[in-house]
Structure formats: C-alpha cells, structure tokens
Amino acid sequence: MQARKYLFSTLKETPHNSDCISHALMLRAGIIRQNTSGTYIWLPTGLRILKKVIRIIKNEMKQCGAMEIAMPFLQKKNLWDLSKRVITYGQELFQVTDRTNKKFILGPTHEEMITYFIKNELQSYKQLPLILYQIQTKFRDEIRPRFGIIRTKEFMMKDAYSFHINMLSLEKTYNLMYQTYIKIFKKMKLKFYAVEADSGLMGGLKSHEFQAPSNTGEDVIVLSTQSNYLANIQVATSIQNNHIKYSTNNYFKKIKILRNNNDIYKKLSNTPNFKKSNTIKTILVKTKNFSKHLFVAILIREDHTINEYKLSKINEIEYPLIFASKQEILNVTGTTKDFIGPINLDFPVIADFSVINLENFTIGSNITNKYFNNMNWNKDISIPQTYDIRYVLEGDPSPDGAGELKMQKSIEIAHIFQLGKKYSKIMNVKIQNKIGKKDTLIMGCYGIGITRIIAAIIEQNNDKNGIIWPDSIAPFTIAIIPVCFHKSTLVKQQSEKIYNFCKKNNIDALLDDRKQNLSITLSEIELIGIPYSIIISEKLLKNDMVEYRERHKNVKKIINKNHVFKIILNNSLK
C-alpha cells in the first residue's frame, strides 16, 4: 500500500471521551471512530486488523473440521419466547416489529435459531458429530456502553455450534474447541487464562471462559499464589471450614443491644466482642413455585457478599434472586430488614460455610432496634443447612490447599459451553440412534468476541508512543520510510525495490511516499504499531546501508541494504 493513497486518520492528541488505553489508542491510531454511544465505524487500518484476526480464527476452525454458515441478524421472537430468554435477557434485547406486525429480535447470539434450523436438517446419528460456525455482527442494548469496543451495542463474534448423539462425543468436541481456542490466542500473542465459569444466560452443564488480564477488564479471575488453581469470581471457592465450635469455655454471656440512632455499626462497634467479621446478616429471598415455603433465610457474614450464581444451584431458591419486599419482611418477621435474625422463623434457613464456625457472634433479633450479641450454635440457635454461597476474598485459602487466593481484573474474550439438551429439548429436536430409537440432540456452543480481542491485545501491548502489534495481526507488517522520496532518485529506487519485493512475497508493506516531515511519519508509524520499519536515506545508501527498526523490541540498527530482503522474509515466516 502506498501511503499517499491511504486514509490514516491519526490524531495527535488523546480524545477527551476515551475511557481506557485501548479506546484512546484506537481513536488516535485511526482504527475506529465513534458513531453513537456503543457503535463504531471501522476505518481502513481497523478493518485490516479485523480481517487478520478473522483469518486466524477461520484457519483454526477449518483445522478442527468446522464448516462456516451465515444466519440472519433478525430472529423470530417466538423462538426466544420458547426458550424464555426473551425474559432473562430483558431490556438488553433489541426488538423489532415489521410492517405486518411480526416481531423479531436482533440477535445477541444464535442458539435458538441454530437449533430450530438443525431440527429439519439432521435425521441420523451418522451425520454426527457436526460443527457449524459463523462470523457475524451481534447486538445488545447495553445500558451503559464503555471502554471503547470492550462493551458496545454492536460487536463482532465468531459463534460455533456442535451437535452430538451422546455426552462422550460432546466432551471430545468441547476439548477440541478448548485446544483450538488456545492455538488461536497464542497465534495472536495474547496473554490469557482459561478458567472454569458460570454458564449464565446461555445455560448448560459446563463452561470455560478465556480471560485476558487487563486492569481495564470488568471481569475478575481468581488465582492461587502457589498452584494452578484458576476460576472466574462467580464460581471460585476456597477451603470450606464447616467446623462448629461447641467449647463452652469460650462462650460469653448473651446480651441484647439496643439501637438508639440510625448508624447501626457506630452503635455496635462500641459493644464488647463486636466485629463485622463476627456479625451475621440475614437476607430473605423467595423460593420457587413448587416449594411449600414462600421464603428462605440466607445467613452470611456481614463482611462477605452473597454470590447469586452459587445460590442459584440450590434447587429451592428462585433465580434470578427475588428479595423479600419491606412489607413481606414485616409480615413474616415483625420487623425491618436491619433487624432480621434466624430465630423462630417458619421457613428454611441456609448459611454460608463461613458462618457456621463463628462463636459469640452478633445477629438480628427479629425485634426492632434490638440485636443479640454473644450468640452460639446449638446453645442459642439451631444449626442451619450450610453451603458455599459467598464470593471469595483476596487472601482466602486456595481450595486445593496450596497458597492463598488473589484477584486479577480481566477482559472476557471467549466462552465455551456444554449446552447438553437445554435447547434441543425446548424445540423437541430428536435424532435416530444406532438402534433406531430417537434421542434428544446434545449440543455445545463456542463464542469468541472478535472486536473485543483487538481491544484486549492493545491493552496488553502498548507504550508511550502507541500500539505494539503482534506480527500476525498488525495492519502492515513493515513500513518502508524513504527520506526525500520525491527528491532523491537513489532513495526512490531502493524504496520501490524493497516494496516490490514485499508485494511479490505477499508481505503487507506500507510505502510511505507522502511529502511530510520525517519525525511526523515516524511518530505515526509507531502510533499505528507497525512491527518493522526500514528507513532509507541518501546518506546511508551511499555506504550501501539502511536503518532497520523493530517496534516490539525497540531495536534500531544500521544494516546492509541487500541484507534487508532476508530479514523481511524471516520476519514474515514468524
């Protein structure tokens, strides 16, 4: 590409509306421009990067036997009504009504549609396993788009779907896709973790996320300081100490604490033996319709936070969680939420493991303005059912007993799921097995956030001068920078010789034949992040030399002009 024919669109200053490093650099490097909140125009430089990311993904998908298809953006709403995800996604769905009053959804994902499609395409187990994928723009009505292309209303994804006659086949394909994703991200030189994760709105039996460490990330992954333990914060756990302390030697006299002002903890903090970590809060949540009780009381330490995902695994509890209203709390306990306690309740009580090994603890009394202090299990209160229902904290012991847990912010770049029969049951998709009977189809799905990957790579690869692209996805592999291109025949001839060599060998080269100051050109090339540069000047050429630069190593050296071709070829083979 000749620079004088190229739209660079670079900016000298950081735009005031950028809210993270990747966003600022993508704007400054002329990769994107904002259209509206959460939607972006991809400029020539951005599109070159995007196409290279897609090429890597397509090559690896081909290697694992996946076939590419293309599904519509518009999906029939009734399919989403069947799965009930129109409710769980809620206002995040873009819904459209056509002139005949038919309702559609702009797809954030395609599980419903692919299941509906495959129902009429597969008849026998002999056609399985099968992997289909597409690369397509998705839509989500984000309430607050942020961090540039990390959280947007419109984004590009690779979504793949696999189909199986049994779980063994699904497990095999799941592991294949897991390894394929590792290959994809390694080719992009991306630092990442594959972590056990919550299946969330997708549902299913098992899932893993691929997370790119970044301080801009909205996700949190949990790691052990001394082992290979890794998990998303939603599913992370620690060693559970469910030892109940019975030693009466440690018991203090039970007392009531009166609250005479609005600041509960200011009052309690003056009470002997009071600690937030030794105080139990009680929260009422609603149960599912089949339960004989309307509520369940949840007990958790005051300094801990309930993990809704873990609670959702308890069969009786409604999910998403529905908390009791002020009036409902008053009706069943006679007090307000600040004073609820697990005493004389007519419905089940569930406690986190961390609660059960407390002694001389503080709890609500179910009497307004009163708490009980120095309470103990079995002596003053019955022992509840115990579960792991909290978020882990930094410093908690690792569940494998090796080291402590630490937290790392990250960007979710991919997610794979064992869906099982979740969608095929809903749509009654059955297939003939080996003995001629009909079995419900088993499915997996596998997503990669293509546009988000680009932001994650920039977050991990930048310096004060701009982006440092890995070779595999850089918009150009090499920049040929002639000094006085339009004045020196010698410089022009050598520049064009190198440029034509690159074209002949299918190497993405940028010949900067613009009439502008050299320092501006060099700054622009560094900002864009082109990995290699050749600077050609008449002064150096008189000695048969040129200057060679490597962006990622910050290398600058003078080399023989004829040695350039070998270096370029070697770099292109990396």
From Swiss-Prot:
Keywords noted in UniProt: Aminoacyl-tRNA synthetase, ATP-binding, Cytoplasm, Ligase, Nucleotide-binding, Protein biosynthesis
Organism: Buchnera aphidicola subsp. Baizongia pistaciae (strain Bp)
Known catalytic reactions: tRNA(Pro) + L-proline + ATP = L-prolyl-tRNA(Pro) + AMP + diphosphate
EC number in record: 6.1.1.15
Protein name: Proline--tRNA ligase
Main location: cytoplasm
GO cellular component: cytosol
Organism ancestry: Bacteria, Pseudomonadati, Pseudomonadota, Gammaproteobacteria, Enterobacterales
Localisation: Cytoplasm
